[in-house]
């Protein structure tokens, strides 16, 4: 874990070894001394960056049983886009739950043509969707994000794309430059006291600080929809970065 000389890394896999006295312990990790400067330099070279961000934040301690740290590359890229991290490795945004059943395209700052492409072909009266002031019935799986979270998830999407390209050696996925590019992408929503995320689709942005969605959607997260605070994350973030081992 870290080399005496920066740039010299084996690229192999380290298997977990558990001492006898730690086998049945709540925390299996062992205190170690590592060359953090070399770890960061190795990661910088691997990512193809000219320099690492001036300020990076990390957890004081790992809370899982095996206490396995994530790749430092992810922390470097998150810091590049000024993003925080939850203790499971994902990037979340918290909002108060606000039930909604109907909306107009202009209320969520999305053109009717884009909503029609997402399946909103008629308004709540059965008329063909042709303007931004028609009233639509929200689908149970769709989500309207607080406008304050729009830039946050633009930066998150850019982080995910850089992570795919620089760390995983794959093609970018989101190609997001502005908030409207997020419309139609999948998210994962969850309440703090439940163990499963609920799949959803981002369809627009509200001027309030709450997260608007169908009552059934909020109830799926937490069994009710009484205005409590829940979190959402980009689905690709959860698929790539969620870990029970951190």
Q: What annotation goes with each model-predicted range?
A:
Residues 1-246:
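Conserved core architecture of multi-subunit DNA-directed RNA polymerases
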């Amino acid at each position: 874990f870290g080399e005496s000389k920066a740039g010299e890394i084996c690229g192999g896999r380290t298997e977990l070894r558990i001492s006898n006295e730690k086998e049945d312990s709540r925390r299996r990790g062992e205190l170690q001394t590592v060359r953090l400067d070399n770890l960061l330099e190795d990661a910088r070279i691997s990512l193809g960056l000219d320099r690492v961000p001036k300020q990076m934040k990390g957890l004081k301690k790992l809370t899982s049983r095996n206490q396995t740290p994530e790749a430092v590359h992810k922390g470097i890229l998150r810091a590049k886009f000024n993003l925080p991290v939850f203790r499971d490795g994902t990037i979340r945004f918290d909002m108060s739950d606000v039930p909604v059943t109907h909306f107009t395209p202009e209320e969520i700052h999305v053109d009717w043509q884009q909503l029609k492409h997402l399946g909103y072909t008629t308004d709540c009266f059965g008329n063909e969707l042709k303007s931004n002031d028609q009233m639509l019935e929200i689908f149970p799986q769709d989500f309207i994000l607080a406008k304050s979270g729009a830039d946050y998830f633009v930066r998150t999407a850019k982080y995910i794309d850089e992570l795919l390209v620089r760390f995983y050696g794959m093609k970018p996925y989101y190609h997001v430059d502005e908030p409207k590019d997020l419309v139609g992408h999948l998210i994962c929503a969850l309440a703090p006291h439940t163990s499963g995320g609920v799949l959803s689709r981002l369809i627009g942005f509200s001027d309030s600080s709450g997260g608007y969605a169908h009552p059934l959607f909020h109830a799926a997260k937490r069994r009710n929809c009484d205005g409590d605070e829940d979190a959402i994350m980009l689905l690709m973030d959860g698929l790539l970065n969620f870990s029970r081992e951190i």
